[in-house]
Amino acid sequence: MKPVLAVNMKTYSSAFGEGARRLARDAARVAREVDVRVILVAPLINASSLAGVYGDVYIQHADPVDLGAHTGYTPVEAAAAEGLRGVMVNHSEHKVTYRHLQAVVSKARSLGLEVLACADTPEEAAAAALLRPSMVALEPPELIGTGIPVSQAKPEVITRGVEAVARVAPGVAVLAGAGITAGEDARRAVELGAQGVLVASAVMKAKDPHGKMLELAEAMAKP
């Protein structure tokens, strides 16, 4: 598979309005310029409109509820109906139970959607991988948003996570996240066995988001 650059837009100011549309156009450019898959993990409120600009969009969360009377919840079917590629679930800023994760993965698979399941530890990554999501993102929460890259500060977390997932679910890709800021951080993550990276502030707070995504993508691209 191609290396993956997943950008969690979170709720930064640049995740909405014209900034979000510009980011989607930038992601499309990078995906054309480099042989790397770029995924935008967007807020629910504008995910479908961004998917009209760039086709590889996930939502940041989904709930294990069916369509119907569930005010304020996001059924997985909503992502399918809006033409999105997939859903992210269990980010450290929005943790869910294992039963919740299991239900979302099962429903998404039945609808042909991808799932990026987040995990804080190698052990949690392996448990998530048992459910057969498309990808698992391993992010030590204490490094998220710090600019201290997991690939440099805690490389053993990546190697242990990759090994743990491979033992239980060899087909599930592992992304490394937390503190990934520069191209060198992304390159090192791939060298440690990850299939890509999950980033947020490095891109969302960058003065030049296109340039930052290009830097990260080029660092992971296979020669």
Swiss-Prot record:
Its main location: cytoplasm. The keyword Ribosomal protein does not apply. Substrate binds at N8, M9, K10, I144, G179, A200, S201. Its EC number is 5.3.1.1. It catalyses: D-glyceraldehyde 3-phosphate = dihydroxyacetone phosphate. It is found in: Cytoplasm. It is an enzyme of class 5 (isomerase). SUPFAM superfamilies: Triosephosphate isomerase (TIM). Gene3D superfamilies: Aldolase class I (3.20.20.70). This is Triosephosphate isomerase. The gene is tpiA.
